[in-house]
Amino acid sequence: DYPAIRGFDYMNYNPLYGWDDQTTERIIEWGTERNGIPTVCWHINVPKNFANYELGDAVDWQKCTYKPDETDFDTSKAIVEGTKEYEYVMLTIKTLAEEPKKVQDAGVPIIFRPYHEAEGNTNTNGSGSWFWWGKSGAEVYKKLWKQLYTTLTEEYGIHNLIWEYNSYDYSTSPQWYP
């Protein structure tokens, strides 16, 4: 006997230090052989020293982070075409897209929970965020989330994702909802 829902994380599929830890294969097995429902989050990291990062370079995982106070990555620029931050985010999405596409080809739906708990400690300006994706506040976060959604569905044709929004604090979650 197995639980109905099992959680996975696509954090290791990224352009910095990514390695194949067989997450996708385990998701497919869970959905096809055990008739389970996979849920997947995405703890995507950024270089701690983004200013000196060259797009496409590999970076040791210890020099990467998801914490907003450990990086100079400017989240507000991640939604502005032509910036290095935007190009980095688009590269991470491209790297990610290969994995849910394989799961889609296997006929398995995924509950996908990207950019979760962005607001952190109940505010809308990003000052209490736990993750870089919430660092620039609710309005930037919503655009970043929609950028991911649009790119995966329209550019990469991924339609097996059931999109889950996950906030931390109910009192501010309506302001952060994409």
Can you say where each PLM-predicted feature lies in the sequence?
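A short, well-structured beta->alpha microelement
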Residues: 1, 169-170
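Substrate-binding cleft of extracellular glycoside hydrolase catalytic domains
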Residues: 15-18, 23-154, 158
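Short His-Asn-centered micro-motif
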Residues: 8-9, 41, 113-115, 164-168
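Aromatic- and acid-rich polysaccharide-binding/catalytic face
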Residues: 6, 174-178
